[in-house]
Amino acid sequence: MIEADRLIAPISNHFKDEEVIDRAIRPKKLADYQGQDHVRDQMEIFIQAAQMRQEALDHLLIFGPPGLGKTTLANIVANEMGVNIRTTSGPVLEKAGDLAALLTNLEENDVLFIDEIHRLSPMVEEVLYPAMEDYQLDIMIGEGPAARSIKIDLPPFTLIGATTRAGSLTSPLRDRFGIVQRLEYYKVADLQHIVQRSAQCLGLSMDSEGALEVARRARGTPRIVNRLLRRVRDYAEVKGDGHICAQTADRALNMLDVDHQGFDYMDRKLLLAIMEKFSGGPVGIDNLAAAIGEEKDTIEDVLEPFLIQQGYLQRTPRGRIATDRAYLHFGIEK
C-alpha cells in the first residue's frame, strides 16, 4: 500500500537495508536511552532489584505506537541484566511446538522477546500461560486415546512482549505481566539529543540547530528521526559541504515533502479528504479508507495517532472530524 512508501512511516518494508545502521546506533544501556524518563527510572530500579536478588526480571509488557523503541528497550533490559535475548514475533509462532522450542533453549534468567505479541494464536497463548506463571511447559505426547500430557520444567526467564495494540491482548495474558510500560511520543528536545547521538555514531558533522530542525519534523518518533537524518545527510553531501545546519536540513526536508509539522502527503491527503470531501466530518473509517486508498488498520495505527495527539483530528463514535487547528494549518475556512 501507499503507506509502505512514506519516508516518515514508522514501519516500512522499503528501508530494510537500513536496519543494520539502526542496530549500530541503538543505545545499549539505560544511561544512553533518551526520553521516556518515567520508563527509564522505573526499569533501572526493577533491574537493580532483580540483580540484587539474583532472580529473573518480572515479565515485561511494552506498548505504544510504532517506532518508539520497544525493541531497543527490550535489548537494553537484556544487556543490563547481563543475559541472552532471543527474539521472535507473534505471527511467526504458528504452533505450540514453535514456542516450546524457544523456551526449552533458554538459559537461566534469559530474555524471550516477542514482538507483535497481540498476534499470538490462541493455541500458542495457552502454552505460554504455565510457562510464564510456573516456569513449566505442558506438552501433549501422542494422539487419540494414547495421548498424554507431560510437564517440562523451564529455567526462570523473562518474557518481554511488545505491541502497538495493548487492548487486543487477552486478559489472561495481559494479567501475567508483572511490569507494564507505555511508551509515549518523544519531546522535540529528546529527539534532538537522539539525532545528535546518531550523527556522532555515523561520523556526521551536524550542529544543534540542524539537529533541532530534523527533530521537530520527526513526529515524535526516534525511528523517523534517524531515517530523516540519513536523507538529510545525503542532501548535505551532494548539495553542500557535508555539514548539516538548520538551513541545509530545512531545504532537504522541504525537498522530501516533510513540512514543519512533520506532515507528509499522506497526512495532508487524509485531513484534506475529511475537510473537502466530507465537509470536515464526521466520516466513518470505511468511507475515509476508500477516499484516500489506504487500509483501515494503517489509518488507525499509523496515520491517526499522531494527528490526534497533535490536535488536528478527533476520533468520535460518529466518525473522524477535522479540528479547527487542521483548518488553520491548511488556511481553509470552515
UniProtKB/Swiss-Prot annotation:
ATP binds at residues 25-26, 67, 70-72, 133-135, 176, 186, 223. GO terms for biological process: DNA recombination; DNA repair. Transmembrane segments: none annotated. DNA binds at residues 315, 320. Residues 260-334 are annotated as: Head domain (RuvB-H). Residues 187-257 are annotated as: Small ATPAse domain (RuvB-S). Signal peptide: none annotated. GO terms for cellular component: cytoplasm; Holliday junction resolvase complex. The keyword Mitochondrion does not apply. Gene3D superfamilies: 1.10.8.60, P-loop containing nucleotide triphosphate hydrolases, Winged helix-like DNA-binding domain superfamily/Winged helix DNA-binding domain. Disulfide bonds: none annotated. CDD domains: AAA. It is found in: Cytoplasm. Residues 4-186 are annotated as: Large ATPase domain (RuvB-L). It is an enzyme of class 3 (hydrolase). Its EC number is 3.6.4.-. InterPro entries: AAA+_ATPase (IPR003593), AAA_lid_4 (IPR041445), DNA_helicase_Holl-junc_RuvB (IPR004605), P-loop_NTPase (IPR027417), RuvB-like_N (IPR008824), RuvB_C (IPR008823), WH-like_DNA-bd_sf (IPR036388), WH_DNA-bd_sf (IPR036390). One of its GO terms (molecular function) is ATP binding. Mg(2+) binds at residue 71. It catalyses: ATP + H2O = ADP + phosphate + H(+). Keywords: ATP-binding, Cytoplasm, DNA damage, DNA recombination, DNA repair, DNA-binding, Hydrolase, Nucleotide-binding. Homohexamer. Forms an RuvA(8)-RuvB(12)-Holliday junction (HJ) complex. HJ DNA is sandwiched between 2 RuvA tetramers; dsDNA enters through RuvA and exits via RuvB. An RuvB hexamer assembles on each DNA strand where it exits the tetramer. Each RuvB hexamer is contacted by two RuvA subunits (via domain III) on 2 adjacent RuvB subunits; this complex drives branch migration. In the full resolvosome a probable DNA-RuvA(4)-RuvB(12)-RuvC(2) complex forms which resolves the HJ. The RuvA-RuvB-RuvC complex processes Holliday junction (HJ) DNA during genetic recombination and DNA repair, while the RuvA-RuvB complex plays an important role in the rescue of blocked DNA replication forks via replication fork reversal (RFR). RuvA specifically binds to HJ cruciform DNA, conferring on it an open structure. The RuvB hexamer acts as an ATP-dependent pump, pulling dsDNA into and through the RuvAB complex. RuvB forms 2 homohexamers on either side of HJ DNA bound by 1 or 2 RuvA tetramers; 4 subunits per hexamer contact DNA at a time. Has 3 domains, the large (RuvB-L) and small ATPase (RuvB-S) domains and the C-terminal head (RuvB-H) domain. The head domain binds DNA, while the ATPase domains jointly bind ATP, ADP or are empty depending on the state of the subunit in the translocation cycle. During a single DNA translocation step the structure of each domain remains the same, but their relative positions change. Belongs to the RuvB family. This is Holliday junction branch migration complex subunit RuvB. It comes from Vibrio cholerae serotype O1 (strain ATCC 39541 / Classical Ogawa 395 / O395).
